[in-house]
From Swiss-Prot:
Protein name (record): UDP-3-O-acyl-N-acetylglucosamine deacetylase
Cofactor(s) demanded: Zn(2+)
Catalytic activity: a UDP-3-O-[(3R)-3-hydroxyacyl]-N-acetyl-alpha-D-glucosamine + H2O = a UDP-3-O-[(3R)-3-hydroxyacyl]-alpha-D-glucosamine + acetate
EC number assigned by the record: 3.5.1.108
Domain of life: Bacteria
């Protein structure tokens, strides 16, 4: 039986929110089988649980936000990407503010945090959402076209193409492919940082956003070049960060996907639209588990791999 996973011990981190600039404490705790991933706002007068789901996503401007009632948690995608990348199914995430800390702008710090806590196999079958026919969402036409799509695949792979007219991006490659069974998430994807332009940062800060952003947690560019003194972590770091975001956004469906995801100029909003479009078509997917590791897609049966 391919088993569910949680973490072995409690682990903690402290940081600031990318947009709020607010100090936040994060506590990750083991959870029982079939709990799923549950964020808990422990700073509120009465703590509020927010289980992840496609329907729990309430805002996708600049980041993925989940919420229930009046309680929200912003910028969940990097942490969710790390959780998905390590194949974890059940975790409680206690948080003392309304935004997940940005840490270094990638998911690498979250991966380290989770691996430090240890991975524990649980006595319950891991359940997947398997895509059994294509599902696609599109917006715009011509130069404004963007789309995202699922196709059937015995595993989970992603292909993402970006389209930024900027010398630094053009020179590094605008398309990346990643296969969870063939490649190594922690080595190939996790260190890719979020990125932005100085002119956009100034505009965002004038609106009370990006208050916690800087060169310590983002790739920052002017009109011509990368301004970070240490340059890029990967040659194609921009497109790889979009893969990182997509892995986190798509895991908000609440279970690991068996599908080939491809996208052109997609973002948090379109990723969530794709999840909702999939769930709205019951004949396009099915829930599956695997009685033996030999039946399971390559990669999912392996223990979470370190750096």
């Amino acid at each position: 039986m391919l088993q569910q996973r949680t973490i072995k011990t409690i682990t903690r981190a402290v940081g600031v929110g990318l947009h709020s600039g607010q100090r936040v404490e994060l506590t990750l705790r083991p959870a029982q089988p079939d709990t799923g991933i549950v964020f808990r706002r422990v700073d509120l007068p009465e703590p509020v649980d927010i289980p992840i789901s496609a329907e729990a996503v309430t805002d996708t401007r600049m980041a993925s936000t989940i919420g229930t009632g009046g309680a929200k948690v912003h910028t969940v995608e990097h942490l969710m990407s790390a959780i998905a990348g390590l194949g974890l199914d059940n975790i409680y995430i206690d948080i003392t503010a309304e935004e997940v800390p940005i840490l270094d702008g990638s998911s690498a710090s979250f991966v380290f945090l989770l691996q430090s806590a240890g991975i524990e196999l649980q006595k319950a079958p891991k359940r997947f959402i398997r895509v059994i026919r294509p599902v696609e969402v599109r917006e715009g036409e011509g130069q404004n076209l963007k789309w995202a799509r699922f196709d059937p695949y015995h595993g989970f792979k992603l292909r993402f193409e970006i389209d930024f007219a900027h010398p630094a991006v053009d020179s590094t490659g605008q398309c990346v492919e990643f296969d969870m069974g063939e490649d190594n998430y922690t080595r190939d994807i996790a260190r890719a940082r979020t990125f932005g332009f100085t002119k956009d940062v100034e505009m965002l800060r004038s609106h009370g956003l990006a208050l916690g952003g800087g060169m310590d947690n983002a790739i920052v560019m002017d009109d011509y070049k990368v301004l970070n003194s240490d340059g890029l972590r990967y040659d194609d770091e921009f497109a790889k960060h979009k893969i990182l975001d997509a892995i986190g956004d798509l895991y908000l469906i609440g279970r690991p996907l068996l599908a080939a995801y491809s996208a052109f100029r997609s973002g948090h909003g379109m990723n969530n639209q794709l999840l909702r479009a999939l769930l709205a078509q019951p004949d396009a997917w099915e829930l599956v588990s695997f009685d033996s590791e030999r039946q399971a897609p390559k990669g999912f049966a392996q223990p979470a791999r370190a750096w």
